[in-house]
Amino acid sequence: MLILVSPAKTLDFEQPPLTQVYSQPDFLTHSQELIQVCRQLTPSDISTLMKVSDKIAGLNAARFGQWQPGFSLDNAKQAIFAFRGDVYTGFDADSLSEDEIAQTQSQLRILSGLYGLLRPLDLIMPYRLEMGTALSNPKGKNLYEFWGDTLTQAVNEALAESGSDIIVNLASNEYFKAIKPKKLQGQLISPVFKDCKNGQYKVISFFAKRARGMMARYIITNKVNTLAELKAFNLAGYYYSEEQSSPTNPTFLREEQ
């Protein structure tokens, strides 16, 4: 199985990574193109474009200015240890064994507005550039047009290398829109997580994000290879619901917390 997840806005570049093993992102030439565009933006432009505070806009203007290729553990960090936030809290990379980290490297891919498609051990420098950002660039009016078919092709290549034909989409809609499902060369599965609130099952963003991270970890640590094995996911009180599921959207429910 090849797993797709979103990145996180929250970053941790303070704690040292758990391994000295790293790889370099595949699309740094593309990233440099975007950085050149972003460097032309003032903090005020960034604040308006990204809908962030002046403080965050200033921080990211500085990050764009400091960004440079030639990543090492001195100026960058592996993506899986740098990203924090709900999905990554659920995934809990810090407690993986060396073998599980190696498995994660081959089985997990992180969609990114700036870096395109990241392997977990790819080094990244701090940034904020969400996939849904309407950033005009030489290839179009937003990042979806900038990346075009590139990320879909990269996912197909990663899927072929994995030896599987199942793609488990645990990314948000904003990020998965960078992929063209009809061009994927495998079976696409997009799990849904619903929590009971006031007697009704619904997707609650905070819980669903954590559940996506937990499922990604579950696939890796349990060496899940089939849809039947995926349906056995039962962490944090979730259970598979045949009634609420469809062939491409296995649905997991949890009672009120």
UniProtKB/Swiss-Prot annotation:
Superkingdom: Bacteria
InterPro entries: YaaA (IPR005583)
Any one GO biological process: response to hydroperoxide
Recorded GO CC terms: cytosol
Family indicated by similarity: Belongs to the UPF0246 family.
Record's protein name: UPF0246 protein Shew185_1115
Gene source species: Shewanella baltica (strain OS185)
UniProt lineage: Bacteria, Pseudomonadati, Pseudomonadota, Gammaproteobacteria, Alteromonadales
